[in-house]
Amino acid sequence: NSILEKTETGCKVLTELKDISRHGIVRIFELGEEMNLVDQYSVYLAGKPINDFNLELLPLYFLQCIKASDFKEAKFCLSEELRQKVDVNHLSSFFGNFESEKLTINEKGYFANLTYCVQGSYISKQYEFKIEKNKIVNILPCEEKKSI
């Protein structure tokens, strides 16, 4: 779902991400000879993050914050030690620009499958999340899988 608002120089588009925190992405376009994206930022559709969820969903919530470029809220999910080790650039480059995320919880732990589109092919990367005291203490990349 998107909402379009006309501006003096182009338009503003709000797209709901339908994630746990109720993020929306605002894209501002300028209209000249072509339509150009001039700015993009995330907002909370409820005015603030909705972060009172089942803690088993913590890795999913974290990834959805990364996807929405809400790095401040994403870092809130990390342990104090890990929070001090990583910055916005590290998180952004570590996970890249993924299209979808899926969380699997089993007896071995918490695993997230992220799907990326690379040159028309879909690639799935899996990450293992280590959680202690309701915070993420480590994130480990697993084996990469390609699909057609």
Predicted regions and their residues:
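Acidic, small-residue rich beta-repeat scaffolds with periodic aromatic anchors
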Residues: S2-I148
